[in-house]
Design a protein with these regions (language model features):
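A structural signal for small-residue-enriched, beta-sheet-centric alpha/beta enzyme cores
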Residues: 1-207
Length: 207
């Protein structure tokens, strides 16, 4: 049970597509003992925990990548938090921001929207200490624009998957959230889900 809780904390609880959560969201891990493997030592338990966490993380990432009409898979990695909660709040604010996600869909790196999300996340941060890298390129240093050419940053976010690194430079804690862009097609799909499926059925696109 502890292995499952630990794995969920760093995987399924670290993903978002639109910030919403279903009351039906469930993670089940079942074991019937058929493998004959016994966890008898701390080393055995640790190895199992690491393997389970890896599987959970990969499955969680697939949920994000399979989101309706998403075009980009983005890893938001925050470091330098004074507390774990501080880093978590910053990462989640960026990962759930409609403005940030919309800019990614438009191939706009827009680090200004990222730092704005960090600013309103509810954690105490020092804007003049924040560094932001987008796809490995410096976008912001000390709260102001870095020297990386805008065209290079724009090119960096045109790929299907990239990472945004945000260093708060306040401490040693970090947090990662896996998210997506926000596309017009996603909005169109979700603005009337039942009508969408009725039309798809009428068009012969569903079984």
């Amino acid at each position: 049970e502890l292995c499952v809780q630990s794995g969920v904390k760093s995987s399924f609880n670290c993903i978002t597509i639109d910030g919403d959560m279903s009351t039906n969201d469930t993670v089940l891990v079942m074991a019937n003992g058929a493998s004959g493997v016994k966890l008898e030592t701390p080393e055995d338990i640790y190895a199992f925990q690491q393997a389970l966490a890896h599987v959970m993380l990969e499955l969680a990432k697939h949920i994000v990548q399979d989101g309706e009409r998403v075009t980009k898979f983005v890893t938001v990695h925050v470091t330098g938090g004074r507390t774990e909660d501080e880093a978590k709040k910053a990462a989640e604010a960026v990962a759930k921001s409609s403005l940030v996600k919309s800019s990614w869909n438009g191939n706009d790196p827009n680090w200004g929207r990222i730092i704005h999300a960090v600013g309103y996340c509810g954690a105490k941060v020092d804007e003049e200490k924040i560094d932001i890298d987008i796809a490995g390129l410096a976008a912001c240093r000390g709260g102001v624009q870095a020297d990386t050419p805008s065209d290079d940053l724009r090119q960096a976010v045109q790929v299907p998957a990239f990472q945004v690194d945000i260093n708060l430079n306040r401490g040693e804690f970090s947090h990662t959230v896996y998210t997506t862009d926000l596309s017009p097609e996603y909005v169109d799909f979700n603005r009337c889900e039942y009508e969408y499926w009725n039309q798809a059925k009428a068009d012969g696109l569903t079984c």
